[in-house]
Amino acid sequence: MACTRRTKTLVSTCVILSGMTNILCLLYVGWITNYVNNNGNVKVAGRTHEKKFDVDSRGETLRIIERLDRLETVVNQHIQELPEKPLKDGEDTADQTLSDSLFAHWGHDLGPESRKVALKKFQYYGYNGYLSDRLSLDRAIPDLRPDGCRNISYPSSLPQVSIIFIFVNEALSVILRSVHSAIHRTPSHLLKEIILVDDNSNNAELSENLQRFVDETNQQRPDFIKVVRHNKQEGLIRSRVSGWRAATAPVVALFDAHVEFSVGWAEPILHRIKEDRTRVISPSFDNIKYDTFEIEEYPLSAQGFDWELWCRYLNPPKSWWTQKNQTAPIRSPALIGCFVVDREYFEEIGLLDEGMEVYGGENVELGIRVWLCGGSVEVMPCSRIAHIERAHKPYTEDLATHVRRNALRVAEVWMDEFKSHVYMAWNVPQQDSGIDIGDIREREALRERLRCKPFSWFLKNIYSEMRTYTETIAYGVLRNSLRPDLCLDQGPDSDNIPIMYICHGLTPQNVYYTSSQQLHVGGLSPTIDDDDNKCLVDVNGRPRLLECSYASNKHMKLSWLFTQGGSIQNRKSKRCLELVESADVDHGYQLALQQCSSQKWTITNILLGKVL
């Protein structure tokens, strides 16, 4: 799936090592269990509790989870400060991290050889392939639909669906469980065919053993399972289009090949599409834990995105809560990546953008395009599917590079004057970015042909929760002439004390200077429900990072006079932000507010048409 619930796992992919110019990528996984602790564990054996439907217009649960998610950046950049565990003989740091992740909640009774096999599979797949191979392909999973869903009846004349599974080097048992689940939990008169798209796997059993299963199934139901095999790896986006081209049913359902369907998943979606073929529908997702394969229930949510175009779960809109009907469709700004759509309408609306690379951003682009060009996007509470969220993605070494390129492509085609926000979020210049986004003329022509609305309409009418940053003048990393190898950094989030740190250009070092003379440090808060951005403030002569709205309401000293290549001076206190030598901190310099000297500051990028 093109998006995982990042609010549930903290996955650190980069450790910044002081004194080095390169980034050493490691894996550090921590499991956030606040939702489970508050609502009870959901086990595979069955549902252990009945949830009450509470009208929560503020969406406190989802906001708490999102706040935890924002700590990921700090973990990513400062994880090297944690004390190291002693390594076992013959074990390196990466092996230890993988072992800790896999065996924290599972496998305590395995012998040494079995642990080695399990760990090797975990490293290869990003989930517990060893355990998957030992689970039934037809295992029972809990029915986590809201209670009212079981009482809804649907017409018998619903359209048929082609289910498309995309995979590359997936565990065979996981693929087969996905297929078995689709067959046994989709009414036979509605399931026309299953299409398996193999994006050039090099795992032999996915050629021989999978084909044997397909042949045996097709002997009983001729041409029921089709296999599309790529001669070269095309990536998730083009693989989904390949699956669509092979489909023949009126409706297509595009899924990853590591899912399990809940009973009654198909009828609610097919009914909505029959009513209006311009609806693109996502089921509600639960989690298959990557280590234990237990099913974890997720709260009902819409699907949105931040300005980097990473998708994220959102609290359902207020209009949904006020209905007090937990079975009602949830209006959603975007899609997670697995979705169901009318086959012909999907072509009319432009399929997926095949000019994108590999993975990431295509789900956000589709949601934006559907809304702007006359369709709608919904999440169905009565349709639930469990999805494995990998501990790590083994099929690409540099996912962020692909997502960044794809995001800039989306921005240029669809976001009009707001495209600058995507460049700001990724900390790349609007001009001469050095990133080739490919030829976008065909997608621009599609937008014109479909007579799509401007992106401002989307922000006003569909994604009003999204924060905008039109006051920004300049952005990037902030360097001081005294030590140009160091950059202003937000430091440990709990301290609210900015620091100088070896420049790496990732989120903790993103700085934004606004027309109201504020200096925002750290990531851009995506929505109004998130914690506010942090602003640089003069607090009793000391530099501090405080929430901008709080500092403004308290009339604190958060306005700074700054010109490119000049000083940074607080308007009220007249003190300048400068570096002073200190033996007590890393890299020998700390920030101070003092009488202005000759120190100069520069920021990386100035927005087009702006003057600093």
PLM feature spans:
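N-terminal signal-anchor transmembrane helix specifying type II single-pass membrane topology
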Residues: 1-75
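N-proximal low-complexity "stem/linker" segments adjacent to membrane-targeting elements
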Residues: 13-14, 50-56, 64, 68-184
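Acidic donor-binding segment of Leloir-type glycosyltransferases
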Residues: 183-229
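Glycine-rich, basic loop-to-helix element that forms the pyrophosphate-binding segment
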Residues: 230-247
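A recurrent flexible, glycine/aromatic-enriched loop bordering the glycosyltransferase active site
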Residues: 237, 312-344
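Short aromatic/hydrophobic "clamp" motif used to bind/position activated sugar donors
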Residues: 252
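Conserved donor NDP-sugar-binding/catalytic core segment of glycosyltransferases
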Residues: 260, 264-313, 376, 382
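Lectin-like carbohydrate-binding module/patch detector with strong preference for beta-trefoil
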Residues: 464-612
